[in-house]
Each structure stands twice: as structure tokens, then as C-alpha cells.
Amino acid sequence: MTNITIYKSNDLNIGFKVFGHSGYDEAGKDIVCAGVSALTINFINSIEEFMDDRFVVTTNEEDGMIDFKFETEPSKESQVLIDSLVFGLENLEQDYKDFISIEFQEV
């Protein structure tokens, strides 16, 4: 199961943690893991490439863990990007609820 925690502050999405492997299929064939990875890595790369917002990211490939947090309140543009990420992850969860779990945590 891939567990996802969306960090919130004052009703804004400010980060996330993805942990675990979905178990949908074996490594290299797991479309659920591939979808989660594509969404999260593209989000981080987009923030890094196109935005000035500062962030901290920690990863552990073995555990399938990515932990991302903005250091300050994100710009409006970055907020749109993270809201889009959450939207995409929630859509994956709807289609693959036995393999993805999303929770929201106030920080």
C-alpha cells in the first residue's frame, strides 16, 4: 500500500509524504507506483525549475519515501501546482483504493 499524507496549514496544501510500494504489481510493471512517482517527481521538478519557492525534500528509494515541504507559504502559482498534484493523487486513489491511501494532516 502506498500511504500519502498531505500537509496542510491554514487550509493550504504545503507539502506531502509518500511512503511505501503499492503492491499492485511487481517492480517495473506497477502502474500505480508509476503514476504516483510521475505525479510527485514532476511536481518537485516543476517547483525547482519554474518557481522561486524554497522547499525541503527527503527521499529514500528503498522504502519508496518522498517527503516534501515548502519552507514558507507557497506562492499562488506553486499553490496551483500542489493543488493539481493532490487532485491527481486523489483521482488515483479513487481508481486504486486498495493500493493507495491519502490522509490530510494539519501542521
Predicted regions and their residues:
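A short mixed-secondary-structure module that forms the rim of ligand-binding clefts
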Residues: 34
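N-terminal intrinsically disordered, cationic/polar leader segments
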Residues: 1-31, 41-107
